[in-house]
């Protein structure tokens, strides 16, 4: 059995115990109590699966948490703030653009647009986004630019469907790259976007995608009506 699985269960058991003591003092609100009940069922199921006693795991979890707290400073307890990173200038973000052969796809809460008339171009993807815990948090806007500075693609959040994850953004970027590469364009991603959206990338600045994914994704892009 993986040691991280066991220690994670032990810490979860102890933290549930702390929350239960809090609720016993009639300090928890309705959502708090509802989560407490659901988590209790979950812990019982995990305990049965792992073959671990919850009471014993709770004691072990207490020791782990106490050891961590002994090493913590007040500074470390502060919640990190989001950082806003910009690849694009204000002019690049606000500039209007026109598509000769418009294609559009909605992927979750993100809208992907591209001009399929663009062929045999070198294209770079730039984005403005926020970061927390050194990971992409919220995409503000992503645009695809040719070497001449023309905008040929875009990914933007849908106002009517707020909320997306870094995985949603990476999947949307994969769709956009696939569509652009289908027309023999060469696409690379800005260094800032690579750093915070992917842990690794190809030498040419292209994020890693499964083999043949670009053709599969290109076929999924639906015509804009």
Swiss-Prot record:
Residues 175-210 are annotated as: CPSF4-binding. A motif (Nuclear export signal) lies at residues 132-141. One of its GO terms (biological process) is symbiont-mediated suppression of host mRNA processing. A motif (Nuclear localization signal) lies at residues 34-38. SUPFAM superfamilies: Ns1 effector domain-like, S15/NS1 RNA-binding domain. GO terms for molecular function: protein serine/threonine kinase inhibitor activity; RNA binding. GO terms for cellular component: host cell cytoplasm; host cell nucleus. It is found in: Host nucleus; Host cytoplasm. It comes from the Viruses. Residues 218-225 are annotated as: PABPN1-binding. Upon interferon induction, ISGylated via host HERC5; this results in the impairment of NS1 interaction with RNA targets due to its inability to form homodimers and to interact with host EIF2AK2/PKR. The keyword RNA-binding applies. Disulfide bonds: none annotated. The dsRNA-binding region is required for suppression of RNA silencing. Belongs to the influenza A viruses NS1 family. Inhibits post-transcriptional processing of cellular pre-mRNA, by binding and inhibiting two cellular proteins that are required for the 3'-end processing of cellular pre-mRNAs: the 30 kDa cleavage and polyadenylation specificity factor/CPSF4 and the poly(A)-binding protein 2/PABPN1. In turn, unprocessed 3' end pre-mRNAs accumulate in the host nucleus and are no longer exported to the cytoplasm. Cellular protein synthesis is thereby shut off very early after virus infection. Homodimer. Interacts with host TRIM25 (via coiled coil); this interaction specifically inhibits TRIM25 multimerization and TRIM25-mediated RIGI CARD ubiquitination. Interacts with human EIF2AK2/PKR, CPSF4, IVNS1ABP and PABPN1. This is Non-structural protein 1. The gene is NS.
